[in-house]
């Protein structure tokens, strides 16, 4: 469970970072 959650987080993180830096 933790591993899949980290995978999802790692996949979403770049989008969040780019949205914050917008």
UniProtKB/Swiss-Prot annotation:
The modification Glutamine amide is found at residue 22. Keywords: Amidation, Amphibian defense peptide, Secreted. The keyword Lipoprotein does not apply. It holds the Pfam family Melittin. One of its GO terms (biological process) is defense response. One of its GO terms (molecular function) is protein kinase inhibitor activity. It is found in: Secreted. GO terms for cellular component: extracellular region. Signal peptide: none annotated. It comes from the Eukaryota. Expressed by the skin dorsal glands. This is Melittin-like peptide.
């Amino acid at each position: 469970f933790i591993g899949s959650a980290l995978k999802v987080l790692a996949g979403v993180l770049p989008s969040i970072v780019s949205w914050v830096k917008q």
